[in-house]
Amino acid sequence: MISATRAAAARLVGTAASRTPAAARHQDGWNGLSHEAFRFVSRRDYASETIKGAVVGIDLGTTNSCVAVMEGKQAKVLENAEGARTTPSVVAFTADGERLVGMPAKRQAVTNPNNTFYATKRLIGRRYDDPEVQKDTKNVPFKIVRASNGDAWVEAHGKLYSPSQIGAFVLMKMKETAENYLGHTAKNAVITVPAYFNDSQRQATKDAGQISGLNVLRVINEPTAAALAYGLDKSEDKIIAVYDLGGGTFDISILEIQKGVFEVKSTNGDTFLGGEDFDQALLRHIVKEFKRETGVDLTKDNMALQRVREAAEKAKCELSSSVQTDINLPYLTMDASGPKHLNMKLTRAQFEGIVTDLIKRTIAPCQKAMQDAEVSKSDIGEVILVGGMTRMPKVQQTVQDLFGRAPSKAVNPDEAVAIGAAIQGGVLAGDVTDVLLLDVTPLSLGIETLGGVFTKLINRNTTIPTKKSQVFSTAADGQTQVEIKVCQGEREMAGDNKLLGQFTLIGIPPAPRGVPQIEVTFDLDANGIVHVSAKDKGTGREQQIVIQSSGGLSKDDIENMVKNAEKYAEEDRRKKERVEAVNMAEGIIHDTETKMEEFKDQLPADECNKLKEEISKMRELLARKDSETGENIRQAASSLQQASLKLFEMAYKKMASEREGSGSSGTGEQKEDQKEEKQ
C-alpha cells in the first residue's frame, strides 16, 4: 500500500504549483481550483485511547438488528425483552402517539401499515431524488417525503422523522437490551454498516448512534465484522471471502488473515440489494396471480398488501428448508360478489425463477472484488456466508459455482456481524490485544477540478485511516477565495458521483493566478468518514473549512433529535412504571378478594364493607390509569394492601385463639376420662 502510494506521488509530482492549466485561461468566471501538483502523506494510526466500561457491538440491520458484548475472550449475543436474539428493525407510531419498536411494532403492521416503518436503513444518508429512493416510494405503504434539506425522510401522523431517528429508536432498544444484561448503563458502542456505504450514509449512522445516547467509538464494515467473528480463534493464515447478502444490502469483501491481523484487500457491493427485494419480487408475483384469478387489484389496498408482504417473507423463509409451501390468506379482500381468499402453492423452483435476476446481481461485484484484490478463486481458502438470505439454497449454489468451493457455515449468518462488532469493541477497550483490523474505503474520494473533472485523492480499497494532501492554486487573477467540491465515487466526471459537501476557503491574499499555494488535506478516519482542512502555504496561516453539505443533519437537528429521543425514553420509562404499578394493584385486588371469600366467617362485616369500598376506589383509579402516574397507582395499591393486611391479621388471630380454645377444651375432657378409668 505504501509503495503504491509513493509511485502515485512520484507520477503526479513535477507540475509546478505556480502554473495554471491552459484550460483555465479559457474559462472566465471559474471560481474553483486548478489541478496542480500533488503531495501525498499517508498515515496509519490504529491506536485507541483507553475506554472505560463495556463496549457493546451492534449490528443495525435493514430487517433485523442484534447486540453482543465481550465476556472475557468470547462475545455473547444478548436476548431482548421478548427473549429473541435478534430484533426486527421496525418502528411504529400508533394513533395515540405511542412508539413501538421491534416485534411489537411488526405485529401490528397489518392494521397500521401507513405508520409502521421498516427497511429505513435503505434511506439513511440518501437524497429524496435518488433513483433508489424513488423506487422505494412505490414499494412501501408509508410515506417517504422530501425534507427541507433535500434528504429522504418518512412521515407518520403528520410528523416527519429522519431515517437516522428511526435507526436511533432501534439502537435505543439494543442499548436497553445490553443494559438489562449488564446491569448498568451502556454508553460506548461499535456499530456496523454495509461495506459499500458512502460517507453520507456512514455519517448518518453515527448520527443515529448519537441520537440514541450512544458514544459511537467506531463504525466498521459488516463483512469485516463477520470475518472477525470467524477468524478470532483461527491460527491458520488464509485469504477468505465474506459474501454478505442481508435484508437490504449486499457486500463482498476479500480479506487476508495472518497471525491476528485482519487485512481487507478489497470490497464491493450493492446498497440496494437484499432480502427486501426478494420479498418485493415475490409480492409482485402473488399480486399478479391473484388479479389473474379473481380480477381484483390489491395494489391500492395497503392493509391487504401488508398481509401479502408478511406471507411472502414467511414463504421465502420456508422454501429454504422445504421444496414447496402453501400461501393461505382468508378474507384478504372483497368485491361486489363477496369476500376473496388467497390460496396458492409455491415451489422452491418457482421462487428461484422469480428472484434469479436478483441473485445474478451479486456475481459482478464478487468478480470485481477478486480483481481489485488481485486474487483468483483458487487463492481463496474459505468463503463465509453472512446475512439471512444466504440460507437460500440457490444463493449457496451460486456462491459455490462462483468461488469453486462449498461455502463455510462456521458462523451464524444472523449473529456474526454483531459478534464481530463486539470483538472490535474489545480491541478498542484493550480487552482483546491480539487482533489488528485493517479496513479499506469502498469508494474513491476526490474533488471537482477545472472542467468538472473528478480528481481522485484517495482511491477505493485504500487502507484506512489514511491522510493525503494536494496543493492547489487559483485559476484567476486576484482570486481571494476558492470553492472545493468533495465527491465520492468511481465516475470520471464529478457531477456523476456523490457530492459529499462543498467548502469555501476565503481570505486568500490577491495575487496573479497560479501564485497562491493552497494545501488541502483529506483525512479519512477509521470510520471511513472524511475530514478536511486547508492551509495557505504563502502566509503559513491555516484555515478551518466547514463542510457546507447540502444534505445530512445539522448539529441543531441532532441536538433536537437527542432531546426527542430522551423524551420518548422518559415516556417509555413512565409507561413501564405505570404498567408495573397496574399489575401490582390488580394482583393486590385479586389476593384481597380471594382471602375475603376464604375468611368471610372470621371477618367483621363492617370491616369487610370498608375494605370493599377501598377496592372499589382502587378499581375507579385503574379505570383512568392512562391519566394517572405510576406513583399514584402504586401508593393507592400499597394503602389497600396495608388495610387488607390489618383485616386479615385480625382474622388470623381470631382463628388462632379459636384453635387454642378448642385444643385446651379437648385436653380437659381427656383428663376426666382418664380419671374415671382409674377409679
From Swiss-Prot:
Segments for region (Interdomain linker): 432-441
Cellular compartments annotated: Mitochondrion; Nucleus, Nucleolus; Cytoplasm; Mitochondrion matrix
Modified residue annotations for Phosphoserine: S408
Annotated stretches, region: Substrate-binding domain (SBD): 442-679
Superkingdom of origin organism: Eukaryota
Enzyme Commission number, as recorded: 3.6.4.10
Its biological purpose: Mitochondrial chaperone that plays a key role in mitochondrial protein import, folding, and assembly. Plays an essential role in the protein quality control system, the correct folding of proteins, the re-folding of misfolded proteins, and the targeting of proteins for subsequent degradation. These processes are achieved through cycles of ATP binding, ATP hydrolysis, and ADP release, mediated by co-chaperones. In mitochondria, it associates with the TIM (translocase of the inner membrane) protein complex to assist in the import and folding of mitochondrial proteins.
Subunit structure: Interacts strongly with the intermediate form of FXN and weakly with its mature form. Interacts with HSCB. Associates with the mitochondrial contact site and cristae organizing system (MICOS) complex, composed of at least MICOS10/MIC10, CHCHD3/MIC19, CHCHD6/MIC25, APOOL/MIC27, IMMT/MIC60, APOO/MIC23/MIC26 and QIL1/MIC13. This complex was also known under the names MINOS or MitOS complex. The MICOS complex associates with mitochondrial outer membrane proteins SAMM50, MTX1, MTX2 and DNAJC11, mitochondrial inner membrane protein TMEM11 and with HSPA9.
Record note on domains: The N-terminal nucleotide binding domain (NBD) is responsible for binding and hydrolyzing ATP. The C-terminal substrate-binding domain (SBD) binds to the client/substrate proteins. The two domains are allosterically coupled so that, when ATP is bound to the NBD, the SBD binds relatively weakly to clients. When ADP is bound in the NBD, a conformational change enhances the affinity of the SBD for client proteins.
Protein name per its UniProtKB record: Stress-70 protein, mitochondrial
Organism the protein comes from: Cricetulus griseus (Chinese hamster)
Lineage: Eukaryota, Metazoa, Chordata, Craniata, Vertebrata
Name of the encoding gene: HSPA9
